[in-house]
Each structure stands twice: as structure tokens, then as C-alpha cells.
Amino acid sequence: MKGSRTITATPEGSPEAVDLSLIGLPPPMSQRPGSASATRSIFRSMSVATGSEPRKKALEATGPGGPRAINNLRRSNSTTQVNQSWTGSPRPAEPTDFLMLFEGSTSGRRRVASLSKASSEKEATWNVLDEQPRGLALPASAQSPSTLDSALGPRRKECPLAPSFTANNRSNKGAVGNCVTTMVHNHYASSKMVSPPKSSNQTAPSLNNIVKAAAREGGEGSDLGKPRKNLSSASQSARGTTGLLRRREVTEEEAERFIHQVNQAAVTIQRWYRCQVQRRRAGAAALEHLLASKREGQRQRLGGGNLLELHRQEEAARKKAREEKARQARQAAIQVLQQKRAQKASEAEHRRPKDRPETRAPEQPRPMQEPGCVTHPKANNAGASIYPTGPADPCPPASESSPEQWQSPEDKPQDIHSQGEARQDLAVSGSSRGKARARATLDDLLDTLKLLEEEPEPLPHPKAYHKDRYAWTDEEEDANSLTADNLEKFGKLSAAPGPPDDGTLLSEAKLQSIMTFLDEMEKSGQERPAPWRESLVLEAGSGSEGSTSVMRLKLELEEKKQAMALLQRALAQQRDLTVRRVKETEKELTRQLRQQKEQYEATIQRHLSFIDQLIEDKKVLSEKCEAVVAELKHGDQRCRERVAQMQEQHELEIKKLKELMSATEKIRREKWINEKTKKIKEITVRGLEPEIQKLIAKHKQEVRRLRGLHEAELQQREEQAAQRHLRQAEELRQHLDREREVLGQQERERAQQRFEQHLEQEQRALEQQRRRLYNEVAEEKERLGQQAARQRAELEELRQQLEESSAALTRALRAEFERSREEQERRHQMELKALKDQLEAERQAWVASCAKKEEAWLLTRERELKEEIRKGRDQEIELVIHRLEADMTLAKEESERAAESRVKRVRDKYETELSELEQSERKLQERCSELKGRLGEAEGEKERLQSLVRQKEKELEDLRAVNTQMCSERASLAQVVRQEFAEQLAASQEETQRVKVELAELQARQQVELDEVHRRVKTALARKEAAVNSLRKQHEAAVKRADHLEELLEQHKGSSLSSK
């Protein structure tokens, strides 16, 4: 920090030569006191303020002009000569960089404010060396800008130093260095101190003392209460020496070194301050970024948390009530503690001996120190102290650090500083140490309780948990019922208990800090001497209260643990019950599924007999529907074309009607113009200009009215034509829709009738087949019973014959069946191919894709159904065979059971195969006949549809003929109308030409008449102007005459009055 210095050169004989500032650079060699010029006085500018309140003692002690600096200077300045007179002229200006340091931070503002208050309370300045108050009155011109801006700022004074110096005064240099470093470190603990350059007359011990003092003060960290350790030694050395200040000399190099040290200290302070400001800004920016990210995350998390909003509101209300109760309890505890403290203080004051000596050397008892807390006694820089220094102050107990857990980082240095100042006051005033220590202990306890009583600062972004560990104490009434919501809630609490929220009840950290503080107070009270034993009663009371709260919290914790265990057991029971219910439900659902499966299988078996017929009918109906849809689309397309033609014709008609209306309107307009021109001629004959103007306005108004009427009428005609056209188109569309609906309804009815007839036939055939099978089975049973006796005798013969005949017959039947099946398949494939070719030729492109998809699905479904039917038929046949075998075995019984059963199985096998072949042949024949019948029906339907198409085409031709006839008639009518309009148009054009000629003549005549009227008006105006001028002249003459008469009257009056 390099500033400007102010040098005032005075004559040689003057003792005031140079004015050096703390913030300036050392003067050059040509202007120093050791040069050829006369001796000059060196002024040192300091800001000193005093106050009388105990609150400001610490600030005065740490300032550059406080008692500590004074003691250090008094101890070592035995030969300093301070005999210069007070000049009363301070520096004219000083940069505000050094004051900005104190105004930039909160602690600096507090110090400046306290100094301002002190200076306002007691207006006095102190000399640095002799401590005598002197009045200080700074002129307005000598005040700096900082003092002008802030009326409450600290005042400055000038202390002249002695002009003569000695060469070997080493203790003074050490004392000055100690004063500067103490002044700097009492306010700011810097970690770097640059030593000044050595001079020729500087010895190593003094420089080492300065460096050691700076290093020791920097090593003590942020504990700002430690620099007061040298106070007792300084005060004792000052008492040991003579009370009067001795004359001593300060060398030029020591003054330069002092200025350099102050400059270096100011630079270090500003660097430290800027570093702290930058660090604070970076931390604030990082915190803001973190808060923004947390806020965004919380907003995203809380976006879907509306389901538990009501529950959270209830929890917040309960939490608020609980906090209010805790706050009231803490306030009551604080009030009780304050009462006890006041009572104990009064009792201690009464019991303290009144004749206690106050001037004895302060001896501090050694309280119990914490392990790891080391004291650093300060070195004696001057080496002139003859009395032993007292022990350094102990480290602050845990009670001083426990409230810092709830303090902000900005308040901690100020609190530590205030505690250090309090300890310094205890060291200085030994007589009131016991009372002050007890009060400090009680103040710390009161501050701790106040911090606990204060409302906690809400976190900027709460974590994922929003409930504290004790939040469910108020919910015991709601949580007694084992509902699903309560079980889920208690399960979440037991599974992942979140950390407690700050401020609801006493957290574990707060409780631990309070207990540590109480333990430390008990230990320090046990080793404290008798005069301070009485102040421990309040601590014991607070310890009992703390232990009571701990026991209460432990009991609550045990209760909550028991409740949690009970809820966990209930939750396990509920889970077992849920598992059992799930298993029972699964069994019930499995049973229902099995029943439904059986019902569905029975339903499928009932409906399988009708699926083949329905599939075929669906194919036929789909083909017919496709044909009908194609026909309807074709008809719809033709109708759209017809509508488009009719729209074009209507547009032509509307256009012709517009032309006709325009021609008619033109003719009518011409007639109206002729009539109006005649009327105008009659009016212009009269030669009245106002009437002409009125007629022209009326004519324009009439033209506008007629134009509006014409436009309205034309628009109305267009709307009527458009409505008529739309009405005709709507009628045609409705007619087509009705026809299409009628045709579709008829087709649907016929298809429904055919389907019902076919269904009835199939049902009758199925019933007949069922009865026939039952009859055949009964006859077969009877025949087998009759033949049983004969077969017993002829068993051996028939066995071989039956085997041979059955083998031959089987081969013959199988060959015949194969040939017949191949022939039937071939014929069937040919017929199907012919039908498919015919149908594919008639379909459209878009119908083909849909039909292919449908056909593929139907074919797959047909194969599946056929397979299922074949399986079911095989099962039925097997059941019949088993029943027949059982009957045969019962009839044969004993001796021939094996042979009869073998013959029976062979015979039944061949008979069943034969019956199957016969049934399949009959089915194929029936299917072939059915297909032939359907083909005939399809051909008949095709013929009917073709006839219907021919009928529709004939009707269409008739309609076209009628349309052409109407068009021809319309064209002839339009031609006649067009010819008439042409004749009328020619006549109207001739009339228009004639009217135009007459109008031109009328306009020329009107112009002449207007000119005549204009000339007459001009002459009338000229006559009027002449008359007005003559009248004006007469008026002026009359005015002059009246003025003359008034003057004469005045003269006459004056003469009459003078004569009287």
C-alpha cells in the first residue's frame, strides 16, 4: 500500500520541518533529520478514542493507542524526550484505503461504530506517552474526506517526537516493534510478517525479538485473545521502573524502520482482507449454485409428491406445536436460571470481604486445562522486566466452544474476540476476577440456552427425509390401529430413520455439547480456590436440569423402541396374513380357471358342428356383398358425375341470369336518367342555383340508394339460385341413398332367409344322421347277440376265412376308396378353380387384398377345426368300439374269451374302417351336391344382378334423354332471351348517347348561369364593401367629434371650477 506523503518545508530555525504519515514512504536522504539541514520534528499521526463503558475496554486495549501500547512505550522509552509544543495542524489529507479496511467487513464496521460512540460520549484525546487528556479541535479545512463523510469517525491527534536521538538504545526498538505487532495481531492474525531491513546500528536480539513476537502471534491462529499475555509483564516492568518518563533519543533509522513496519502491517492487513473477501465471494457463489441445484432437485422430487401433501401438512402443524412447547419450556428454564443467578450473585456480594486489598499483584489460579491446549508465554522483548510474569490464561473451556456449533462463520471471530477481551479485563482487574469469571460462566450458559431457545434457521433445501426421529411422538393416537398406511409408515421409519431435523427438540449434538460444558464446569469448580466456589451453585443447578432432561429423553427413547418392536411384530403378522390370503386367492382362481376352461371346451364342442357351414356361408355372403358394394360404388360414382354436370349447368344458368339482370338494370337506369334529365332541364329553366345544388345532392343520394338496392337484389338472386342448386343436389343425394339402402336391405333379407333355410336343413340332416346311427348301433347289438351262438361253433373256420377275406376286402376297398377320393378331389379342385377364377375376375384391386387376408385366416381356421373334428370323431368311434368290446366279452365270458375278443377286435376294426369309408363317401357326395347347388344359386344371383344392372342402365339412358331434351330447350330459351336483351341493349345505348348530348348542353348552360351568378355576387360584395367603408369613415369622424366635445366639456368644467 503505497501512498503519498506530505512534506512541509519550513525555515531553518523552525522546529517543525517534516510531517511523516503512517501511510507514506520514508523521506529521501536530502530531507532526513541527519542531513545538513537543521533538526526537524517528526510527527506521527494516530487515531485514538476513549470511552467509559466496560463494553469498550477491549476495543481500547486492542487499538494502537490503548493501555497495552502505552505500557510498552512507557516501559522502554526511558530516554525519550517529549517536550515539543502542540502545533495543532494535522495533515491536510489522507487516503481512505486504511479506513476502508475497517469499513469493508462487519467486524470493522462494529469497531468503527464503537469507536465513534466512545468518541461521542467522551470528547478527549490522549497523548501516547504521558496519557494526559488534551482538547482537540480540528479545523474544517484540515479534516480528511473520511472524517467529513462520517461525523462519528475517530479523531486524530499529532504526537511530536524528540528531535535528538541516541545510538545504542536497543530496548526502545524492541518495545516499538512489540507495540506495532501487538496492534496488528490484536485485530488481524496474519500468517506472514516481513521483517524490516537491518541498519548499521541495529543488533540481532532486538530484530529476533520482533520476528519471534510476530511468529508467535501468527502461530496462535484465530484465537485472538492470546496477544494479551505480555500485558502483566509489561505492567509489572512499568511499575518496577520509575513512574516518570525519561528522556531518550530515537535514531533516524529506527523511525524509518517503524514506518516501514507499519506500512508492511497495513499491506498484510489489506492482502488478508482482500483474500478473505474473495474467499467469501467464492464461497457465496458456490453456496448459491449448490442451493439452486438442490432447489431444482427438490422441485423435481416434490413434483410427484402431491399424494402425501395432506399428511405432511399435519406433520408440520404437529411439529410447530411441539417446537412451541419446547420453546416455552426453554424460556421458563432461562427465567429460573436468571433468578438463581441474581440470587447467588447478591449472596456472593454480601459474603465477599470488604477490606480485601486491591493493589496486590494479580495472581491467577490455574484452572483445569484440557489436554492439547498449550499456553505460549510471550517473550520479553526489552529484557528489562525484573518481576516474574504471571501464567498465561488457560484455554477456553468447552462451554466457550460449544455455542459455536450454532453460530455462523461471520459471528465466530467476533465472539472469540469478545471472549479474549473479557479474559484480558480479568487479567487487568484482579480484584473483581471471581465475580467476572462467575458472570462470564453464567453468561456463557445463558447464551447457550438462548441459542437453543432461538428458532433454528431452516435449511435451504431439505434432504429426502422430512421427518425427525421424534416426529411420531404426537402420532401415537393415530398409530394405535394397525392399518395398512400406519404399518407402511412405521416400516419406513424403522427401515431408514433419517437424521433429526434441527430445532425441534434437543438433538444429540446439542445435548452432548451441553453435557461436555457441564462436566468441564464441575472439574474447574473442584480445583478452583474458595472465593470462587460460590459461583458453582448455578452450574450444579443447570447440571441437574441437564441430567433430568437426559433421563427424560432416555425414557422416551426406550418407550419409542418398545413401540417400534411392537409395530415390527404386528407388521410381521400382517405380512404372514397377507401371504396366506394370497395363496388362498391363487387356489380359488385356479379352480375358477379350471371350471371356465371346462365350460369353454363344452361350448366349443357344441358349436363345432356349425362352423364349417358358417364358414362357407360367410364366403358366399362376402362375395355377394363385395359384388353389391362394387355395384353401389359404381352407381355412386355415376351419381357424382351427374351432380357435377348439374352444378356446371346451374353455374351457367346463374351466369346468364346475372347478365340478364345487369342488362335489365342498365335499361332501367337509362330510363331513370332520362326522366331525371328532363326534371333537371325543367328546374334549370327557372335559374335557381340553390335548387340545382339540392337536386344534385338528391340525385347522388338516389344513385347510391338505387345502387344499394340493385346490389342487394342481385345478392338475393344469387343466394336463391345457390339455395335452389343445393336443394336439388341434396334431393338427388337423398334419392340415391334411399335406393342404395333399399337394395342393401333387400339383399340382407334374402341372405338371411337363405342362411336360415340352410341352417334348418343342416340341423334336420344332423338329427336324421344321429337317429340312423343310434338305430344302426341297436341293430348291430341285436345281430351280434344272435350270431354269438353260431360264432362259438364256427370259430376256428371263420378265423382263417375271415382273415383272408378281410385282408382281400380291405385291399379292394382301400384301392377303390383311393381311386374315388382322388377322382372326387380332382373334380372338386377343378370346380373350385373355375369358381375362384370367375370370382377373381370380377373383384377390384382393393377388395383382392382384404379377401386374401380373410381367406388365409379362414383356411387356417378351417384346418384347425377339421383337425379338432377328426380328433373328436376318432374319440367317439373309440368309445363305441370299447363299449362293443365290453358287450362281446360279457357275452363270451370264459373259455373263448381270448379268441372271441381277438376276432371281435379284428371284425370291429374292419367294420369301423368300412363304415368310416362309407360315411366319408356319403359326406363327399353331399358336399359335392351342396357345392353344385350353391353354384347354381350363385349363377342365378349373377343373372338377377345382371338383369338389375341392365334395368338401371335403361333408366339411366331415359334420364339422359330427358336431360338432353331439357338442355336443348334451355339453350333455345337462352338464345331468345339473349336476342331480346341485345335489342334492348342497342336501344338503351342509343338513348344513352342522346342523353349524354343533352347532358353536355345542360352542363354548358348551367356553367353560363353559374358565371352570371358569380358576377352578380361579386358586384353585390363590392357594393357591400363600399358601404362598410363609408360607414367606418363616418364612425371615425363621429368618434373624433365626440372626443373633441369631451375635451371642450372638460375645459369648461375646469374653468367653471376655477372661477368658483
Curated annotation (Swiss-Prot):
Residues 263-283 form the IQ domain. Residues 398-408 have a biased composition (Low complexity). Belongs to the CEP131 family. Residues 1-11, 32-50, 73-88 have a biased composition (Polar residues). Localized to the pre-acrosome region of round and elongated spermatids in testis but also present in ovary, brain and adipose tissue. Residues 1-244 are annotated as: Interaction with PLK4. Disruption phenotype: Females grow normally and are healthy. Males display developing sperm flagella abnormalities resulting in infertility. Post-meiotic defects during spermatogenesis with abnormal morphology of elongating and elongated spermatids, including teratozoospermia, premature apoptosis, but without increase in DNA damage. Sperm are immotile with shortened and morphologically abnormal flagella, and altered intraflagellar transport (IFT) and/or intramanchette (IMT) trafficking. Displays normal postnatal multiciliated airway epithelium. Lacks retinal degeneration and kidney cysts formations. Residues 217-226, 314-327, 344-363, 409-424 have a biased composition (Basic and acidic residues). The modification Phosphoserine is found at S14, S35, S47, S78, S89, S105, S114, S146, S150, S481. GO terms for molecular function: protein homodimerization activity; protein-containing complex binding. PANTHER family: CENTROSOMAL PROTEIN OF 131 KDA (PTHR31540:SF1). Component of centriolar satellites contributing to the building of a complex and dynamic network required to regulate cilia/flagellum formation. In proliferating cells, MIB1-mediated ubiquitination induces its sequestration within centriolar satellites, precluding untimely cilia formation initiation. In contrast, during normal and ultraviolet or heat shock cellular stress-induced ciliogenesis, its non-ubiquitinated form is rapidly displaced from centriolar satellites and recruited to centrosome/basal bodies in a microtubule- and p38 MAPK-dependent manner. It comes from the Eukaryota. Residues 1-96, 136-155, 217-248, 314-437 are annotated as: Disordered. GO terms for biological process: intraciliary transport; intraciliary transport involved in cilium assembly; intramanchette transport; manchette assembly; non-motile cilium assembly; positive regulation of cell population proliferation; positive regulation of intracellular protein transport; protein localization to centrosome. Self-associates. Associates with the centriolar satellite BBSome protein complex Interacts with BBS4; the interaction limits BBS4 availability for association with the BBSome complex, and hence negatively regulates ciliary localization of the BBSome complex. Interacts with MIB1. Interacts with PCM1; the interaction increases in response to ultraviolet light (UV) radiation. Associates with microtubule; association to microtubule is reduced in response to cellular stress, such as UV stimulation, in a process that requires p38 MAP kinase signaling. This is Centrosomal protein of 131 kDa. Keywords: Cell cycle, Cell projection, Cilium biogenesis/degradation, Cytoplasm, Cytoplasmic vesicle, Cytoskeleton, Developmental protein, Differentiation, Phosphoprotein, Spermatogenesis, Transport, Ubl conjugation. It is found in: Cytoplasm, Cytoskeleton, Microtubule organizing center, Centrosome; Cytoplasm, Cytoskeleton, Microtubule organizing center, Centrosome, Centriolar satellite; Cytoplasm, Cytoskeleton, Microtubule organizing center, Centrosome, Centriole; Cytoplasm, Cytoskeleton, Cilium basal body. InterPro entries: CEP131 (IPR030465). The gene is Cep131.
